Amino acid sequence: MRSPAKYVLASSPGFGLLVAMVVFLFPPLACAQGETTSAIIGQVSDETGAVVPNATIRITNRDMGLRRTASSDAAGRFDLPQLKPGNYSVRVEAPGFAPQQNDDVVASLGQKQTVNFTLHVAQSSQTVEVSGEAPLINPANANTSTSLNAPALENLPNPGGDLTYPLQFAAGALINTAGSGNDFVGGTNGYGNVEFNGLPALANGYIVDGLETNDPLTNLNSGLSTNLVLGLNSIAEVTVNTLSYSVDQGRYGASQVNYITKSGTNRFHGNLYELWNGSILNAADYFLNATSETHKPRSNVNHFGGSLGGPIAHDKLFFFFDSEWVRIALPIFSTITVPSPAFQQCVLQQLPQDEKDFYQNMFSLYGNTSGTPLTVLYCPFNSDGTPASGNPRNGNGCANRRGVSHSSDDHEQVQTARIDYNINPNNTAWFRFQADTGVQAAYTDPINPLFNSVSAQPLYSFAAGYTHVFSQKLVNYFNPAFSWYESLFAPSNFQQTLAAFPIVLQGVGGNAPFTTLGGLDNTWLQGRRATRFFINDNLAWSHGNHEFRFGTNTRIFRLNDYDFGEGTVPTVTYTTLQQFINGVASTANETFPQSTNEPFNFLNLDLYAQDTWRLTPKLTWTIGLRDTFNSNPLNPHDQVARLSGAFDSISHDVNQPLNAVIQTGLGNLFAATPAAILQPRTAIAWQFQPDTVLRAGFGVFSDLLPGSIADLIASNPPYVNTFQGGLLGTAGGTAIAPGVPNSAVGATIAANESFAYGFSHGLTGLPPVAITAVPSGKLHAPYFMQWSLGLEHQIGSTASVKAQYVGTRAVDQPYLMQVNGYQTVCQGCFAPLPYMQPADPRFGAVTQFSTGAGSNYSGLQLTAMKRLGHGLQGQINYTWSHCYD
């Protein structure tokens, strides 16, 4: 989904085709129920078809010995909810009938596994054993999902072992989405994420053992040091729910991706693995070999690890441990342009004395300045020392171009430990701890390693689950979780780097040829620290042919945002070689925050109630309501400033001081937010033929705004000010070198001091400042509506086909728009843009944050599956879609 154009929703029809095919070890199909649990349901009848009430059903987890007992009701039904996913034996006993036992029941993640029994009149004490492959379709649930178990995950080709890779095999997936920077708030700036059903990538939820792992700053998947989401070897099963009308599934409308980690069992088990790819296995680039000054950069991937699990006490206490390590050397080839030694001497002879020290220090940072001579406009001489010809002169003695072969080193390691405890038949618990540490080579400079930047990205998380059986009809599952992570980007010794070169110097245009010096120092320090607490609780109550569920998903989130440090290192530009020679800056931009980092608090409280009603043995109706409260993001330091309303609602009188139109000392990002966001959902599943199921549903979903919204709104003046000096700036100053008379950087410092004084004293005529405006009044929460109608048919015992129509509509989606622009063509041209001056000269760029964008999607999704034998299954997905944004 893309943002609308100015004043008009940018709408363009388009058609999409998507075909995906995969062959993997057979996983049981899942229908979404809970995030970390499963269930076994069924009905007991006799040979005449009459139901058998009061039959005793005993289930046993074959791996861990967990046992639970239930009785069939007056209609012969039984329901055992909130089970740990795994392999179970189910035994049924009733007076006058021979016992029956099925040892091949696989209760998958989020699945209600249906197991029906037909009892025979007892003629001996022998137990009847029943078995058979799990059906390819589940007739009791209207949701759409794809499930992969551990053997499937291990054997599925997966570059990098990324946890999110299996998403692309779900119906309706759109791979490798990307968008413009304006899409970032809307979540369509892809980052390798997957989109479903025309909804943005931030509408995907990644849940591991009940712990939401989305990056809270972007709401996208959370790859750390290697930009991979590691931990695949610790996963027992993943379920991708793309049409989930069960309100206990969560808030995410596009997909809810649930993972559960492996557990120890009564038998010791484990594995070891090593994946390696090095330079010796990779061909060199032809053009690198053709150039004597370059060589093939070093490349290496070393991905290894192992796991071990087993019993501590038989049938009682179990452990599992997994360790994963990744070492990566990424090859990098860069082409750089550097000043020649002769040109350096020429510049030093012409510069004013007070700028020579800065330039001498700058030239020393270039190091190797050899290379192929490059012709540059205004260069006065050639590489052989002769004067350049032409008017203006156009010599090749000022700049040398060469290639640089180097590599960046990243490493990451993940340790996962889990304990499972069967306290007694009515109480079970598990605990999982994970530590993910590593260092990312955030930027590798081709000129001087002094400007290299790194990011240490540790993450520590804890999750637990506790199941209590009050009775066979009332079971509660409590699932708290916690995570903390840090992701800060800067050179290893930032102060040393700035002492060596305190600015970033950029040439702009073909006549300013030299490669940027200073790396990405103008973007450092940036990043975040994030602390999150989660409280999930799900109460399941079976009453007759109803199963009621009540629960909560609560997230408490503390974001320490370090992005306010961006721009504090000045960026100085020049546009011609003459400007470089004379030390003249075209622009100099510098940001002045009162603090380089600020905390923000978020609370997301969701409550839900749901009824799954078996109207008949063949027809199931699910109806539920989810209520969401998203707090108004709070800065406890009251360092938020914003306009008194949307930009077009304020007075644009230039004689009105800025402190009369910009509100300061605020804690909340918005004036007000909704107290409740109601999300009703309903669906049916109707098995109108023995091998055919019709599914239909409608639901409303509301996603969270990403934490990056704090970057936008909390970067407003007077707490964060940005000014531009230089020839093209408004603050004045011309010298490239800082700290000298008439310095462009010094002019920005003076402009900031002038603005701070003038703002606090209510003066007018201040230097124009950039600002982000928010909507007037209460923020409209973004939400989605989703509906579907589908048929699924099983062919024999080895194949199935599915066709479904999916429609979505997104409403009140966030977008950004520049609203203080102007045009210089003519009076009345390009209306409503004003001529020759902005609508409000007190401001520079004004970014309006709004939530008025929308989209519509219609798609036909076809899926065919075939069991191939030897544990293999093939699947083909085809999607035809039409999206109107």
Where are these regions (language model features)?
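Solvent-exposed loop/turn elements at secondary-structure boundaries
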Residues: 163, 497-500, 508-514, 635-679, ...
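Hydrophobic, lipid-facing positions within transmembrane beta-strands of outer-membrane proteins
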Residues: 192, 253-255, 302-306, 413-417, ...
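Transmembrane beta-strands of outer-membrane beta-barrel proteins
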Residues: 268-272, 319-321, 429-431, 476-480, ...
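Outer-membrane beta-barrel channels and translocator barrels
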Residues: 201, 262-264, 313-315, 424-426, ...
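Residues on the lipid-exposed face of transmembrane beta-strands in outer-membrane beta-barrel proteins
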Residues: 130, 196, 259, 306-310, ...
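Periplasmic N-terminal accessory/gating domains of Gram-negative outer-membrane beta-barrel systems
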Residues: 91, 97-263, 278-282, 287-293, ...
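Periplasm-facing N-terminal accessory domains of Gram-negative outer-membrane beta-barrel systems
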Residues: 2-3, 9, 18-149
